[in-house]
């Protein structure tokens, strides 16, 4: 009987030493993990929706045909590096402003006029998130470039009209070029076909901040229908020709975003520069 009592006491001691200790350790680990999750930024995840884009209420009508088979505008490329490693959008805007007669440089545009925000506070359609001087920043969408351009032109006392042409066909953009207006156009880096919608955070207003991985911005300034090419001022490459069909596909992958800066006399009848609506591009998440 004494032996059984001793064995029972020994078993109880083993339980207290190992099982209670392990349970306490597990509890501490769980609590630590919980604290970490509460303070960690939301991860980048594949977004399964589409991004609503703001565009003009009345878009230019797609032309039945282009007035010329070949057009080359004398737009000069502006390179984003080394000063603006993630500033392709504001660099393309700078090239467009230079063409319109404004001798502004990309750094001035980035530092004084580009609408910027810290992460977590806004979406990429409302501000450039991060700093274009930082290689780890993100970028922005067409509405940000529209407002940035409008602010700059107003500060200079100019009367050029800035229009968001998001949703227009590439043929419509080529019509703009044929009529003397280069187009700030979103495409992809090196025309890669790999594009992903990535969710990063939800803003205080409840909007999802979703960025298109590999998005890029160029200034469309020419085309050659016979060679099936478009000419762009690429902030990474300079003035280059790209295959027209491939460029059109990449333009569609990033929701057909485009912006023009032009004289009011070049606006088509019925166009407006003030009213906006929200459209949902019919592009599935990659």
Question: Where do the protein language model's features map onto the residues?
Answer:
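Active-site-adjacent structural segments surrounding the nucleophilic cysteine of cysteine proteases
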Residues: 2-5, 10-151, 155, 189-191, ...
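Noncatalytic regulatory segments and standalone regulatory/sensor domains
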Residues: 199-212, 218-286
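...with weaker cross-activation on analogous glycine-rich loops/strands in unrelated enzymes
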Residues: 151, 155, 167-186, 192
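Structural recognition of the beta-strand scaffold that forms the well-ordered cores
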Residues: 87, 162, 182-186, 219, ...
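Short linear loop/turn motifs
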Residues: 110-114, 165-171
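Loop/turn elements at helix/coil->beta-strand transitions in domains of secreted/extracellular proteins
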Residues: 156-160, 179-184, 227-228, 256
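Short loop/edge segments at beta-strand edges and connector loops
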Residues: 73-75, 164-167
């Amino acid at each position: 009987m004494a032996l059984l009592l001793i064995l029972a006491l020994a078993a109880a001691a083993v339980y207290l030493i190992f099982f209670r200790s392990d349970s306490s350790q597990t509890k501490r680990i769980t609590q630590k993990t919980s604290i970490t999750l509460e303070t960690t930024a939301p991860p980048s995840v594949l977004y399964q929706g589409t991004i609503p884009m703001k565009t003009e209420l009345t878009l230019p009508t797609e032309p039945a045909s282009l007035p010329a088979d070949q057009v080359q505008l004398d737009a000069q490329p502006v390179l984003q590096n080394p000063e603006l490693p993630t500033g392709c959008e504001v660099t393309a805007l700078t090239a467009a402003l230079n063409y319109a007669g404004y001798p502004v440089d990309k750094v001035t545009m980035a530092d004084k006029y580009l609408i910027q925000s810290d992460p977590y506070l806004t979406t990429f359609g409302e501000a450039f998130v991060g700093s274009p001087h930082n290689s780890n920043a993100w970028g922005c969408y067409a509405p940000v470039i529209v407002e940035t351009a409008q602010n700059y032109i107003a500060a200079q006392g100019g009367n050029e009209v800035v229009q968001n042409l998001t949703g227009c066909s590439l043929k419509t953009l080529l019509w703009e070029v044929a009529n003397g207006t280069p187009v700030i156009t979103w495409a992809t880096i090196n025309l890669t076909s790999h594009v992903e919608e990535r969710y990063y955070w939800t803003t205080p207003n409840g909007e999802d901040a979703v960025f298109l991985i590999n998005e890029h911005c160029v200034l469309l300034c020419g085309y050659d229908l016979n060679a099936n090419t478009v000419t762009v001022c690429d902030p990474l490459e300079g003035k280059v020709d790209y295959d027209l069909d491939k460029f059109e596909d990449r333009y569609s992958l990033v929701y057909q975003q485009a912006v023009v800066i032009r004289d009011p006399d070049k606006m088509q009848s019925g166009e407006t520069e003030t009213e906006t609506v929200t459209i949902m591009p019919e592009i599935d998440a990659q």
